[in-house]
């Protein structure tokens, strides 16, 4: 609703209900709509119930085992192996959207940490990371995946149930999109056909 209130921004949702859409199809929707920006919003999970915080990813090779493991879990429904994904990422890494995606990821991450810290003082800024997420592969535009809190952490799961907390997440993402938009000339986040 926040982005939709901006006359210079057209928002395209890949889904409006809680039904599964294949990861590749989400990116295909953005490409068909000729989107200028792709933001995939997720709630994180970990076997470590104490894990908490926010992290934002852009497409590239995984830089640490944790990022690779998270990408493998998120990608499981696609049926693609991590080795095959690494080959795809190598091809895509030549694309000039890498730097733009990193820049947008930094804006998203900074905004989430700043907006959520006042209501979740124990939040951890897990930083901007890179990993081969299927949902980001094939995007024709700068694209990021934001992990907005941990469902596996009881305290953060309870926060995610609160309207105010979700509104803060939305506000942080909204402001990141606007900041990114200001860095470019004549950008629209998505254009309708």
Regions found by a protein language model. Name each.
Residues 87-90, 155:
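Acidic/histidine-rich, surface-exposed loop or edge segments in extracytoplasmic proteins
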Residues 1-83, 91-98, 102-106, 187-193:
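Catalytic-core regions of hydrolytic enzymes
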């Amino acid at each position: 609703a926040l982005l939709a209130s901006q006359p210079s921004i057209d928002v395209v949702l890949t889904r409006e209900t809680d039904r599964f859409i294949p990861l590749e199809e989400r990116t295909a929707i953005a490409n068909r709509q000729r989107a200028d920006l792709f933001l995939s919003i997720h709630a994180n999970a970990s076997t470590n119930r104490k894990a908490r915080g926010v992290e934002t990813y852009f497409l590239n090779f995984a830089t640490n085992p944790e990022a690779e493991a998270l990408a493998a879990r998120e990608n499981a429904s696609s049926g693609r192996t991590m080795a095959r994904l690494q080959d795809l990422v190598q091809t895509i890494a030549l694309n000039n959207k890498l730097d733009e995606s990193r820049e947008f990821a930094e804006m998203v991450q900074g905004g989430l940490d700043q907006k959520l810290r006042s209501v979740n003082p124990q939040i951890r800024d897990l930083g901007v990371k890179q990993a081969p997420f299927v949902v980001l592969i094939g995007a024709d535009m700068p694209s990021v995946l934001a992990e907005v809190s941990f469902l596996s952490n009881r305290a953060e799961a309870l926060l995610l149930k609160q309207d105010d907390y979700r509104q803060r997440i939305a506000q942080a993402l909204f402001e990141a999109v606007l900041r990114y938009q200001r860095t470019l000339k004549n950008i629209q986040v998505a254009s309708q056909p």
